[in-house]
């Protein structure tokens, strides 16, 4: 018996509609198009054309699979992604439109809107790529990308098609998925620019370094199973969907291991699940990363986050006085990430906030935090031995109300909101005695203006020095600034509240240098 295209589509659409498939008409057309190898437009203008028995039987077999909630992409074996058709089967996750945001962020000048706490970025890979010649001119000059969990390879291959001078290493734990990815690489003629590795995350990468690490990792919690579509739950690979630890396990693995595989100034671009922005950003903040941008999908949900490691090497000052001990290195590796400063950690912060610039070995810094447990203390110090000592003292005394920025002051100033600090301590900074060096002083005219803007009205700034000329030059500088009032004009020898005599203070006394203190109050004015 023969039926027309119109009759076949109508009956199939009714059956699909009865099981809750909202796009029943479209899916019926897709299945029939696949059977007769004609475009959908052909079906729409030839509704009265008769189908033969072979065509109808083939169509009915495919329809029966769809009626059992098998995804249509698996039935026809292809799925469109980023304007290309990729081979898919039950061994790989079906590419989603939301994941195109991941590629978009990497490749294009994105029109996607970053969140208010983001710096608008675009064309991450394009910027890297444009700074280097094509790979054909020099084999070592190309953008090197790592994709973790490649699945069908749709992300990696899309990037290669969009970026001619990119090279990709793509990993997956599934050998079946790797076979699919290799077939897609063959289809789009990029086999010479992609290396597909059987690996559980970073395990088999050796010592390779990458400009960008990109991933759409498994991020669904098993608790979400009751809310999932049958097509996804019963047919797509479990390992590509679900992650332990409330869906966050993969992000923890990436955050803990990615730095050693990134080149200097490298980036991480990750897709996240619905409502996971806060949890994922906290994981990366705790492991020493900056959150550079958060991008939304077409539904307005946060979908892609751009991370970069906090750079501990961008500093003008000495970083290590003597070799770090095993304990010190362990503290820097394992404890410092928990306390690393980032601007995101100040969002919705209700406590009083104090900043100490150049805390040395940290005796004063830790004592202030201990004496004021309801406040937050931010410490800036380039001397890693001192940073490690703060972490040691904090651990011994169970002090947690602090953040550390082990870098040059200038790199943190833009991340401190104006009118946010209740107090600033600048105790015994390098005096830079020579005239040509004075511009390097922490306490100079330009920085004083910036610090003034960071202080709340009536906030305090404490400056101390054991170098007499530097101290009185600082007073002259302050007297030129009408936004500060000196609170201790009659006694510069008396320190501020909760001050502890540090080792440096003791050395100054022994060397017959007198420590002096200026206690300033910020007077109400424009910020």
Swiss-Prot record:
Q: Where does substrate bind?
A: 216-219, 434, 466
Q: Which domain of life is it from?
A: Bacteria
Which molecular-function annotations from GO does this UniProt entry contain?
nucleic acid binding; protein-(glutamine-N5) methyltransferase activity; protein-glutamine N-methyltransferase activity; tRNA (guanine(46)-N7)-methyltransferase activity
Q: Where is this region: HemK?
A: 1-309
Q: Where is this region: tRNA (guanine-N(7)-)-methyltransferase?
A: 310-527
Listed A to Z, the keywords are: Methyltransferase, S-adenosyl-L-methionine, Transferase, tRNA processing
Pfam entry (one) = PrmC_N
Record-linked CDD domains: AdoMet_MTases
Region (tRNA MTase) spans which residues? 314-527
Q: Catalyses which reaction? A: L-glutaminyl-[peptide chain release factor] + S-adenosyl-L-methionine = N(5)-methyl-L-glutaminyl-[peptide chain release factor] + S-adenosyl-L-homocysteine + H(+); guanosine(46) in tRNA + S-adenosyl-L-methionine = N(7)-methylguanosine(46) in tRNA + S-adenosyl-L-homocysteine
Per its UniProt record, what InterPro entries does this chain match? DNA_methylase_N6_adenine_CS, HemK-like, N5-glutamine_MTase, PrmC_N, RF_methyltr_PrmC, SAM-dependent_MTases_sf, Small_mtfrase_dom, tRNA_(Gua-N-7)_MeTrfase_Trmb
- List the EC numbers from the record: 2.1.1.297, 2.1.1.33
Q: Which residues bind S-adenosyl-L-methionine?
A: 149-153, 172, 201, 216, 356, 381, 408, 430
Kindly identify the residues recorded as the active site: 430
Q: Where is this region: RF MTase?
A: 1-311
Q: Which family does it belong to?
A: In the C-terminal section; belongs to the class I-like SAM-binding methyltransferase superfamily. TrmB family. In the N-terminal section; belongs to the protein N5-glutamine methyltransferase family. PrmC subfamily.
Q: What does this protein do?
A: Methylates the class 1 translation termination release factors RF1/PrfA and RF2/PrfB on the glutamine residue of the universally conserved GGQ motif.
Name of protein: Bifunctional methyltransferase
UniProt source species: Rickettsia felis (strain ATCC VR-1525 / URRWXCal2) (Rickettsia azadi)
Q: What is the lineage of its organism?
A: Bacteria, Pseudomonadati, Pseudomonadota, Alphaproteobacteria, Rickettsiales
Q: Which gene encodes it?
A: prmC/trmB
């Amino acid at each position: 018996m023969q039926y027309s295209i119109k009759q076949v589509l109508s009956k199939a659409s009714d059956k699909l509609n009865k099981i809750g498939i909202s796009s029943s008409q479209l899916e019926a057309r897709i299945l029939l198009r696949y059977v007769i190898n004609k475009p959908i437009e052909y079906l729409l203008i030839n509704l009265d054309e008769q189908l033969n028995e072979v065509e109808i039987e083939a169509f009915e077999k495919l329809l029966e699979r769809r009626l059992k909630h098998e995804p249509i992409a698996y039935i026809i074996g292809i799925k469109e992604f980023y304007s290309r058709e990729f081979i898919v089967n039950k061994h790989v996750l079906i590419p989603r439109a939301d994941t195109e945001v991941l590629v978009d962020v990497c490749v294009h000048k994105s029109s996607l809107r970053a969140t208010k706490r983001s710096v608008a970025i675009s064309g991450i890979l394009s910027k890297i790529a444009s700074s280097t010649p094509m790979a054909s001119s020099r084999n070592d000059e190309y953008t090197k990308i790592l994709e973790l969990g490649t699945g069908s390879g749709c992300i990696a291959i899309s990037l290669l098609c969009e970026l001619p001078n990119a090279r990709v290493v793509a990993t997956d734990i599934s050998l079946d998925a790797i076979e699919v990815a290799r077939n897609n690489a063959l289809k789009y003629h990029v086999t010479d620019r992609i290396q597909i590795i059987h690996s559980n995350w970073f395990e088999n990468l050796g010592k390779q370094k990458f400009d960008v690490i990109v991933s759409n990792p498994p991020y669904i919690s098993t608790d979400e199973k009751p809310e999932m579509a049958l097509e996804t739950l019963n047919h797509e690979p479990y390992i590509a969907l679900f992650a332990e630890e409330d869906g966050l396990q993969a992000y923890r693995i990436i955050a803990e291991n990615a730095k050693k595989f990134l080149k200097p100034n490298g980036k991480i671009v990750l897709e996240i699940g619905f409502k996971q922005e806060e949890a994922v950003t906290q994981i990366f903040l705790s492991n020493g990363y900056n959150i550079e941008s958060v991008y939304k999908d077409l539904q307005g949900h946060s979908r892609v986050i751009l991370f970069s490691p906090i750079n501990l090497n961008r500093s003008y000052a000495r970083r290590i006085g003597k070799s770090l001990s095993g304990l010190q290195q362990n503290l820097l590796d394992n404890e410092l990430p928990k306390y690393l400063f980032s601007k995101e950690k100040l969002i919705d912060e209700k406590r009083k906030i104090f900043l100490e610039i150049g805390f040395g070995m940290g005796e004063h810094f830790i004592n202030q935090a201990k004496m004021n447990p309801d406040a937050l203390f931010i410490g800036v110090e380039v001397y890693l031995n001192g940073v490690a000592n703060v972490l040691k003292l904090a651990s011994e005394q169970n002090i947690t109300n602090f953040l550390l920025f082990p870098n040059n002051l200038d790199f943190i100033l833009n991340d401190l909101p104006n009118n946010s600090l209740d107090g600033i301590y600048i105790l015994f900074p390098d005096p830079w005695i020579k005239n040509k060096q004075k511009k390097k002083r922490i306490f100079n005219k330009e920085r004083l203006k910036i610090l003034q803007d960071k202080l709340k009205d009536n906030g305090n700034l404490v400056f101390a020095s054991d170098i007499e000329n530097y101290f009185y030059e600082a007073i002259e500088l302050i007297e030129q600034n009408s936004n500060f009032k000196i609170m201790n004009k009659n006694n510069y020898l008396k320190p501020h509240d909760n001050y502890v005599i540090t080792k440096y203070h003791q050395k100054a006394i022994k060397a017959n240098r007198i420590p002096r203190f200026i206690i300033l109050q910020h007077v109400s004015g424009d910020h």
